[in-house]
A protein has these predicted regions:
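Exposed alpha-helical structural elements
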Residues: 22, 31-34, 153, 173-177
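Generic secondary-structure transition motif, activating predominantly at the C-termini of alpha-helices
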Residues: 26-31, 141, 158, 162, ...
């Protein structure tokens, strides 16, 4: 079992699980274990594939839909809407330091939030039953009542699709392209940049 002496969410010392502040920010005040009663292995592959196939979040890293049930993080059952996204250690074995990727993403988000006061998605680090870490983030595209908040990404604003821009259309833009789109579509674009 994975033990800790810091909050796996806020990284504050003196906690052996999530701190009250983390529980409020990430888990709506519910007491939640930082250890999942589940590990990714050959026996659980089907459950993972089913979850991955029903989530539509952009990006290249594997993402698994999750909910909180009885104080535990669990994979979203069929027919339910996930409120969290789990990002485990990538399966691609040639990635150097791949076991550090969940912690790196979490630390980066905490620096953005705590040091630079950037409004980020609520997030934490958690662990599978075998001790492997995963990054967990609360979905910001759903309201508390469960209704969906419509989101636009820059690929759709730019009119890019797989058909007109190729398979990797979401990743072919640049920051300059985004700045130009802001200038075209936002009256106070200087403030947004």
């Amino acid at each position: 079992m994975k033990t800790t002496d810091v909050c796996p969410g806020t990284l504050a010392s003196g906690f052996n699980t999530y701190s009250p502040l983390c529980l409020r920010k990430v888990f709506e005040g519910k007491k939640v274990s930082h250890i999942m009663d589940f590990s990714i292995n050959d026996d659980t592959g089907g459950e993972i594939v089913a979850s991955v196939n029903k989530i539509s979040i952009s990006g290249v890293q594997e993402k698994i839909s999750a909910i909180i049930k009885k104080g535990k993080i669990i994979i979203t059952p069929a027919g339910e809407t996930g409120r969290y996204i789990i990002k485990p250690v990538p399966e691609y074995r040639n990635l150097r330091f791949r076991h550090n990727i969940p912690a790196n993403e979490h630390l980066t988000m905490q620096i953005a939030s705590q040091v630079y006061k950037i409004n980020t998605a609520a997030n934490a680090l958690a662990f599978f039953a075998d001790g492997n870490p995963f990054y967990i983030t609360k979905r910001f595209d759903y309201k508390a009542d469960g209704s969906k908040i419509k989101q636009e990404d820059f690929a759709s604003i730019a009119g890019k699709t797989e058909r007109n821009s190729g398979k990797d259309f979401k990743y072919s833009g640049s920051y300059e392209d985004i700045a130009n789109l802001l200038k075209q579509n936002v009256s106070a674009w200087q403030v947004e940049m």
